[in-house]
Each structure stands twice: as C-alpha cells, then as structure tokens.
Design a protein with these regions (language model features):
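C-terminal accessory regions of radical SAM enzymes
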Residues: 44, 297-354
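Canonical Radical SAM [4Fe-4S] cluster-binding loop centered on the CxxxCxxC motif
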Residues: 97-134, 185
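Conserved AdoMet/S-adenosylmethionine-binding subsite of the radical SAM
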Residues: 137-147, 151, 160-306
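Conserved, mostly hydrophobic/aromatic
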Residues: 49, 115, 274
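Short, charged beta->alpha transition segments
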Residues: 90-93, 103-106, 137-142
Length: 354
C-alpha cells in the first residue's frame, strides 16, 4: 500500500501532538492549546493535506483551518453546540428533515481532516453518533414514506469514508425511490484526500445520474494537481455535477484577491462555486468569523470584477434552524448594536446576530 492509496492516507493520519511536532514547527500558542482543544474536538490530518501546510508559518491558510488556536477555547454567548438545530429536526437517527422537500442523512462520523470551524463538532469523530445498519433501514423506510422529499443529501463526517460497496448500496436504494428527484453528496475528500476518488468509485457514481457532489474548497492552495486529476475523473468517469461551498474565514480567504483566485481556479477545474457561507455560530468559532458587513463588501467588489460563473451566493444558515438566507447589499435594512436586520425575497424580515 502506497501514499497514493486512500486507505494508506487514512491509516497514517496524524492525530497527536508528538507526531505532529515531527513534521512542523508549532508556535507557542498552537502547542499550548493543542491538548485542551483536543479534549473538546479531535485532531486529524492526512499526510497529503499536511504536505500543503507551511511547516513554519503560523499564518498559513491551510494551517489555520486545522490547528487549534486559543480562540477555540472561548465560547461566545451567541455560539451553540448545534447552531443549525439539526438534532431538533431529526425524526430518525442520522436524518435531519428541516426543509420540506429535502433531507440530510448523516452516515459517517469520520473525516480525514477535522476542520476547527466544523458545524458538527458536537458529534463528528464520535462513533455512537453514526447510524448502524438497522438504522440505515429505518432511514430508507422514512424516505420511502415521505413523498414530499425530492432530494437526499449524504453527509457526515464524510460519506466517502464508507466502502465502495456501501456507497453503491445506499445510492441504489435511494435511486429506487420514485419520488426522489436527485441525490447529493457533501464531501471534503477531494480537498483533503483526493486519492479517494478511484476509478471504481467513479464507476459507481456513473450509475446514478443525476448525482451532485458538493466539495468544500476554502483556499486556492487546496486546488493542487492531484485535485485536478481527481476532479476530472469525477466529471468524465463518474458523470457527476460538481459544486463547491466555501466558508468565509478570517485571515484565510477574506480578501477579494483570494476569493477571485479560488473561484476562477474552481471553474477552471470544472467546479461551479455554489455557496460562500458565513461561518456558523458553533462554539469556538469566533476566531474565524468575518463581520457580515465585510462579507457583503467583498461580494459587492467581486460581482463588479468577476464572471458570473465564478460568483457564489453569499449565505448565512440562521442559528436556531431558520435555514439559509441570502446576504447582500440589496437586502440589508439596518445594522443594530448586536445584529443585522435583513429583508428576504418574499418581503419578510429576519435578524442575524454579529
């Protein structure tokens, strides 16, 4: 088994401080908070993704996404364990049915790399949170019985952690449900472990058109030659449509220049920029949050200089389970002391804390 094998990458993930220090030079802050942060949320990084990280520079944008910082140990008043209220809208273990016509199916608790701003920090890396095979059957029965569901989104953790056989089974069962219009997979493995995209996996994907895969690239440094090979394989052999959702992250991608490079490069690789998310208000995320007015200003500048194909929608998933809302200069009504007041498409108003 070689480094080009995804199972080798999984088996050789760096998960502890001592091993990490053999590969990179840690700042005093990074080392001091590592253990305390790991008590709340696991650390893991693949050798591949580690190779993208600057081993000596604490301001490296890859490094900032994966190494704990002191701000992660601070819990602000507006931060929640489950900011999107997924547990409240969970009729069956692993299934979040928050929107009428679509449901998220959480089928893996494992990620190759654990992002420090993860919305699901409360459950990712915890085996007890993953549905077992009997609970898979219960979820499939739920999807069959709820004819209003037009889309099922496989998520996690990372759903591509599952074996090819299990992925084939789940996609086959879901595709056989008449009222399901299409399927979507959310995965960060094309970013953190592109060797997961094998010929055999793409052969499975090709059987289930239309299949949409949403990747999670946040910085142009992540778009490597290895990624280009994997993405080309997904499109040409897997017959999938590729979209990308980024998170707007302070000191990672919060400039016009970085977002321009990221989104043009995504389109060149064959991936449509889909969403730019305002960082969710999950506990420990304050160090990543870009003020919404700065995000709006960025989008205003981007729309004036970039092709429409390269421009994502800037959105906020409302804390408390209110769903996604579009953020933009045309919809901001008022900035208050601790929140923004927006108007949405149907004339209703909503408030977003900052």
């Amino acid at each position: 088994m070689s480094q080009e094998d995804w199972m080798w990458q999984m088996q050789n993930r760096i998960t502890d401080l001592a091993t990490l220090k053999n590969h990179i030079t840690l700042s005093a802050e990074e080392e001091s908070v590592f253990q305390a942060a790991q008590e709340q949320f696991s650390f893991s990084i693949t050798p591949y993704y580690l190779s993208l990280l600057d081993p000596t520079n604490p301001t490296c944008p890859i490094r900032k996404q994966v190494l704990p910082r002191s701000s992660e140990l601070v819990r602000a008043e507006n931060e929640w364990e489950d900011p999107l209220a997924e547990q409240i809208h969970m009729p069956i273990k692993g299934v979040t049915h928050r929107y009428p016509d679509r449901a998220i199916w959480y089928i893996s608790h494992i990620c190759a790399v654990y992002c420090r701003f993860c919305t699901r920090k409360r459950k990712v890396s915890k085996p007890t949170e993953t549905p077992n095979r009997e609970e898979w059957r219960e979820a499939l029965e739920y999807f069959r019985n709820h004819t209003e569901i037009k889309e099922v989104i496989l998520s996690g953790g990372d759903p591509l952690t599952l074996s090819d056989q299990h992925i084939d089974y789940l996609l086959g069962e879901l595709s056989a449900i008449d009222h399901i219009n299409h399927l979507r997979i959310h995965t960060r493995y094309p970013v953190t472990m592109p060797m997961r995209i094998t010929d055999s996996l793409c052969g499975i994907f090709s059987k289930y058109f239309p299949l949409y895969i949403v990747t999670h690239f946040n910085h142009p440094k992540e778009l490597t030659q290895e990624v280009k090979v994997a993405v080309t394989k997904l499109i040409q052999k897997g017959n999938v449509t590729l979209l990308n959702q980024s998170v707007l992250l302070k000191d990672v991608n919060d400039t016009v220049e970085i977002l321009e490079e990221l989104n043009y490069k995504l389109v060149r690789f064959g991936i449509k920029p889909y969403y730019l998310h305002q960082c969710d208000e999950v506990y420990g995320s304050s160090g990543f949050v870009v003020p919404i007015e700065d995000g709006i200003r960025l989008m205003y500048d981007i729309r004036g200089r970039m092709s429409g194909l390269t421009v994502p929608n800037y959105v906020k998933d409302l804390t408390g389970g209110g769903g996604k809302v579009l953020l933009g200069p045309n919809y901001l009504i008022e900035k208050k002391e601790s929140s923004y007041l927006f108007k949405n498409f149907n004339g209703g108003e909503y408030e977003v804390t900052h």
